[in-house]
Amino acid sequence: MSRLDLDRRDFLKISAVAAYTISGMPGFLARAAAQAGGDKTLVVIQLTGGNDGLNTLVPYSNPAYYAARPNIAVAKSDVLTLGQGLGMHPALKPLMGLWDQGQLAWMENVGYPNPNRSHFASMAIWHTADPSQASSEGWIGRISEQIGDPFCASNIGTATPLALIAQNYALPTIDSVDNFQVRLPAGVQDAFDLMLSAQRGGEAAYLEQATRSMLKHTSAVQANIGKYRAGASYPDSKFAGQMKDVARLIASGTGQRVLYTSLGSFDTHAGQRGDQDRLLGEMAGALKAFYADLETQGLAEKVVVMGFSEFGRRVAENDSAGTDHGEGSVMFALGRGVKGGIHGDSPDLEKLNDGDVIYRQDFRGVYAEGLTGWLNLDARKILGGDFRGPGWLV
């Protein structure tokens, strides 16, 4: 096949091979051919395992809390008081600066109808935004489909979560920003060179233009990643490294709408104070550094962080100084676009559902506000209905 006889069939075949190859790379390496629109980013943090909301946002003024947890309750003297009889776990102290600036929001009693205490089932519900468990598409995957950009979001981690699964494809997962570069397999680079050197019109010309744009954008992003210098000192932890990668992607101009990462495990059936205290401290230290980094880069106004867990824990401690799977829990959000404060009432520890805090705020309402108010997307289409949120955005 010479440079002069590259017909439409050959061109499309090469394009398909190239697209398949690039789709296996980190998401932003191929997103220039699609336009996501907007310049704001939502960072989603998954607290895997079922974080105990009562020891995160502590109802320290409620005697029932201490009666139910004689061994694992956070002492009143240690609570970081916020108001409404609630306060943060002491390990969250690095976030007090954001609270004082009105840039940290807590959402109380968040859950969904007919709660499921299975990790797998409940996480799937949060990932798909479908309590009926009928959907196989993630809510972030549906964002990708709505805006027509299969590279509008990435997961920073290892396995791609269901939240980032679209109908016909999975959005990319990046295990480490340090560990990649654009490398086309043997033969594919020659195919690209041949494809881009031929003269053509119509559909083939459009694909050529898109490919050139993609490669140009890829080179620019890679150069920016190489130039990135953290604007804050990050703690030495895996999660802090993930948040640093998130900051690097944002600062490098990837234009992605959603970046997703996880921390865990919060499945604290035994020895909860040791494990949860450590994880909350790891989260808080990393988020403080991340936000300081964004401020230094001049990007703080463009980023909001939202955190969730698949369920909370039971009110009463168990015999192993831990807690078992529960129902309602807390969500959090931080950033300049956040309406700081506590959204929702303090949990009712007298009126329980089989020993669990009763959910009062559907998590889809929290999602909806992020989709509509921050990303300027049609939440109704993405979530399959209208859901009222707690008002956590400015």
Show where each model-derived region lies.
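Conserved H-loop
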Residues: A300
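A post-motif C-terminal structural segment
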Residues: G312-A316, A321-V330
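Feature for exported/extracytoplasmic and membrane-associated proteins, marking the mature portion
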Residues: M1-Q297, A316, V330-V394
